[in-house]
C-alpha cells in the first residue's frame, strides 16, 4: 500500500471513483384510454384493477362498492389508499375480483388500487410504500396436517 498521509494523497490513489447515480425516476404507466392497470392479491383472492381520473366512483365486479362490500369496514379498507395518498374522490376505480372471501377480496382490491395509483402517479409511491400498501400480504391459511384435527389442533387426548 502506498504511503497515504493526507487527504490529497488518498484522492490521488483512489482517483475519480464513479459517483452513485440519483434514484430512478419513474415514468407514469397508462394505456391508450388514460388508465393504469394493476393486479392485487390477498389470501386466495386476485383482483384486476383499472384506475382513471374521475369523481371517486368505485365499481367491483360491475356493482357499486357499497353494494358489493356491504360491511362498512370493507369499504373503509378500499378507501385507505386514496386517504393515505391524499387523492380522495379524484379517481374512478373499475375492479374485477375472484377467489377467496369478502375480506380477502377487499384486501386484494386495496392492493391493486395502491399498485395502480403508484403506476398512474409515481410521486404517490413514497406515501403508499410507507403505509405498507404496496407490499403483498403473504399470510395464507396453514395446511391441515395428518394426525391432527386441524393445522395445529390435536385430537382430544384421554389419559385414562
Curated annotation (Swiss-Prot):
Pfam families listed in its UniProt record: Ribosomal_S9
Entry's Gene Ontology cellular component terms: cytosolic small ribosomal subunit
GO biological process: translation
Keywords tagged on the record: Ribonucleoprotein, Ribosomal protein
GO MF terms held by the record: RNA binding; structural constituent of ribosome
HAMAP family noted in UniProt: Ribosomal_uS9_B
Xref: NCBIfam families: PRK00132.1
Alphabetized PANTHER family for the sequence: RIBOSOMAL PROTEIN S9 (PTHR21569), SMALL RIBOSOMAL SUBUNIT PROTEIN US9M (PTHR21569:SF1)
Family: Belongs to the universal ribosomal protein uS9 family.
Protein name as catalogued: Small ribosomal subunit protein uS9
